[in-house]
A protein has these predicted regions:
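C-terminal binding/interaction regions
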Residues: 2-23, 71-137
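Short solvent-exposed loop/turn micro-motifs enriched in small/polar/acidic residues
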Residues: 25-27
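Short beta-strand scaffold segments in enzyme catalytic cores
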Residues: 29-36, 109
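Compact, glycine-rich, soluble single-domain proteins
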Residues: 46-60
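Short, solvent-exposed cationic patches
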Residues: 58-78
Length: 137
């Protein structure tokens, strides 16, 4: 994706959301901003637990919040990591959840506070989601 300015505001919302992350163990805050089909945005943050398996990532928090609000059509997601100098992509669990609720061509933007950013699609971060393709048939 070449037109990064198209996602600047969404990325800024993710970066702002990251300030509210609860990360007392890793000190690695993450924010996500999920654009809905009506143009509104729902944010999420990572929420850690000392039992790391119970931690919830920012991407899933945003998606689960939107679903709890009765929203199910998402057009783009931005993920911001202010505590890293490099972009950090979604974990495997988040890739699975993102692919469950977003189309393969939906934009995914992730980046750091250093200005490094990667722009791709759901299919780019989860290229072998055959289950999604089967469900569409």
């Amino acid at each position: 994706m070449k037109d990064s300015s198209k996602y600047d505001h969404l990325f800024e919302q993710a970066m702002e959301a990251a300030k509210n992350a609860y990360a007392p163990y890793s000190h690695f805050r993450v924010g996500a901003a999920l654009r809905l089909d009506d143009g509104s945005v729902v944010t999420g943050v990572n929420v850690e637990n000392r039992s790391y398996g119970l931690t919830n990532c920012a991407e899933r928090t945003a998606i689960f919040r939107a679903i709890a609000m009765g929203k199910k059509n998402f057009t783009a997601i931005a993920i911001a990591t202010p505590d890293a100098d490099y972009p950090v992509g979604p974990c495997g669990a988040c890739r699975q959840v993102i692919s469950e609720f977003m189309q393969p061509d939906a934009p995914v933007v992730f980046g750091s506070s250093a200005g490094n950013r990667i722009e791709t699609t759901v299919g780019g971060v989860y290229p072998f989601d055959s289950l999604h393709e089967l469900q569409q048939k």
